[in-house]
């Protein structure tokens, strides 16, 4: 058993390190550490979502593929004509990219799969816990959230909510970073009120329904 624990622990450590690295990359992206990179991701995401709001997903994918092919085919023809006029033999303009190894390694695939599987298992465990009412208060919170979502869904469609989500994701961190002290103060007040109300509700519940002490 001691021999097998070493590779497993190292694999888990590498997965955790990968998760931390990806988390830092997302954080830097949302906090606009690199304005050019964040702007490209934000702009590209918004263009895609706005396109999906106006056209069907099949049309959007078709237009994207046609746009990409228009660029690559035009560049390929341009370089071929240029080589014919200048009588040069530079070869295929995309040869370095065609010869580049873009295959996904088994190690990278296994790391990504292990990381994704851990998140999926955690989500499944939380879903089962909520739907089977392990904690009544948490299940009631989910019911209240879903009830509110019915009203939100009646006003906004899925694409509109995604657009609003992207806007909030790329603007809220900047606002929070600028007004961190004030926001933390009000969040603390709200958290205290919610905690107080939750404790009052739990105190009135029968013993079998109260949250199990950890």
From Swiss-Prot:
Pfam hit, one: Reticulon
Keyword field contains Endoplasmic reticulum: yes
Location relative to the cell: Endoplasmic reticulum membrane; Golgi apparatus membrane
Keyword list, A-Z: Endoplasmic reticulum, ER-Golgi transport, Golgi apparatus, Membrane, Transmembrane, Transmembrane helix, Transport
Coiled coil: none
Stretches assigned to the Reticulon domain: 26-214
Gene Ontology cellular-component terms listed: endoplasmic reticulum; endoplasmic reticulum membrane; Golgi apparatus; Golgi membrane; neuron projection; postsynaptic density
Membrane topology label: Multi-pass membrane protein
Disordered, as annotated region: 1-22
Residues passing through the membrane, by range: 46-66, 150-170
GO biological process terms, semicolon-separated: brain development; endoplasmic reticulum tubular network formation; negative regulation of amyloid-beta formation; neuron differentiation; vesicle-mediated transport
Function of the protein: May be involved in membrane trafficking in the early secretory pathway.
Family matches, as PANTHER family: RETICULON-3 (PTHR45799:SF4), RETICULON-LIKE PROTEIN (PTHR45799)
Subunit structure: Homodimer.
Protein name listed in UniProt: Reticulon-3-B
């Amino acid at each position: 058993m001691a021999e097998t624990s070493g590779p497993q622990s190292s694999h888990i450590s590498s997965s955790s390190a990968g998760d931390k690295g990806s988390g830092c990359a997302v954080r830097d992206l949302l906090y606009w550490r690199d304005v050019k990179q964040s702007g490209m991701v934000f702009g590209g995401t918004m263009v895609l979502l706005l396109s999906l709001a106006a056209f069907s997903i099949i049309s959007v994918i078709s237009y994207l593929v046609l746009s990409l092919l228009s660029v690559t085919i035009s560049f390929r023809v341009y370089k071929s004509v240029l080589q014919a006029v200048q009588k040069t033999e530079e070869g295929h303009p995309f040869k370095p990219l065609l010869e580049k190894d873009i295959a996904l390694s088994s190690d990278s695939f296994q790391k990504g799969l292990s990381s994704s599987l851990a998140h999926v298992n955690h989500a499944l465990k939380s879903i089962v816990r909520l739907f089977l009412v392990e904690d009544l208060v948490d299940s009631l919170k989910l019911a209240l959230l879903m009830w509110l979502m019915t009203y939100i869904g009646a006003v906004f469609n899925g694409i509109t909510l995604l657009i609003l989500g992207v806007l909030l994701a790329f603007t809220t961190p900047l606002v929070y970073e600028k007004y961190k002290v004030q926001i933390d103060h009000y969040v603390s007040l709200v958290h205290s009120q919610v905690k107080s109300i939750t404790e009052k509700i739990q105190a009135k519940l029968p013993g079998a329904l109260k949250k199990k002490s950890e």
